[in-house]
């Protein structure tokens, strides 16, 4: 009976040991293990400076984006104005072509009439 009791106590100790291992406090590690406060402070300072750099970079990129948007709007406006100008010039070309055709027909008719008149005078 004593051996059974000792065996049971050993099993209980083993179970308690495993149980304690399950609920050990977990130490949070950021990068390499930080053992003292000076390392933590250095890390905080480094992270803050990195954050400031990233904020500056964000500002620069926002400025670049604003400039590109302005350039895009300017180009879009110019494209619209050039399209309008192109349409106006196309209309003018069409009108001038029609007018030229009418003038050529009138001139040809006049020349034909003059030629016919000269032919009649010869006969």
Swiss-Prot record:
Signal peptide: none
Main subcellular location of this protein, as a coarse class: membrane
Entry GO MF terms: Atg8-family ligase activity; identical protein binding; protein-macromolecule adaptor activity
Keyword Ion transport recorded: no
Short name of any one Pfam family annotated for the protein: ATG16
A GO cellular component entry from the record: phagophore assembly site membrane
Keywords: Autophagy, Coiled coil, Membrane, Protein transport, Transport
GO BP terms: autophagosome organization; autophagy of mitochondrion; cytoplasm to vacuole targeting by the Cvt pathway; piecemeal microautophagy of the nucleus
Lipid bilayer topology: Peripheral membrane protein
Subcellular location as annotated: Preautophagosomal structure membrane
Coiled coil: 57-106
Gene3D superfamilies for the chain: 1.20.5.170
Family: Belongs to the ATG16 family.
Assembly description: Homodimer. Part of the ATG5-ATG12/ATG16 complex. Several units of each may be present in this complex.
Function: Stabilizes the ATG5-ATG12 conjugate which is necessary for autophagy. The ATG5-ATG12/ATG16 complex is required for efficient promotion of ATG8-conjugation to phosphatidylethanolamine and ATG8 localization to the pre-autophagosomal structure (PAS). Also recruits ATG3 to the PAS. Involved in endoplasmic reticulum-specific autophagic process and is essential for the survival of cells subjected to severe ER stress.
Protein name: Autophagy-related protein 16
Organism: Vanderwaltozyma polyspora (strain ATCC 22028 / DSM 70294 / BCRC 21397 / CBS 2163 / NBRC 10782 / NRRL Y-8283 / UCD 57-17)
Source taxonomy: Eukaryota, Fungi, Dikarya, Ascomycota, Saccharomycotina
The gene coding this protein: ATG16
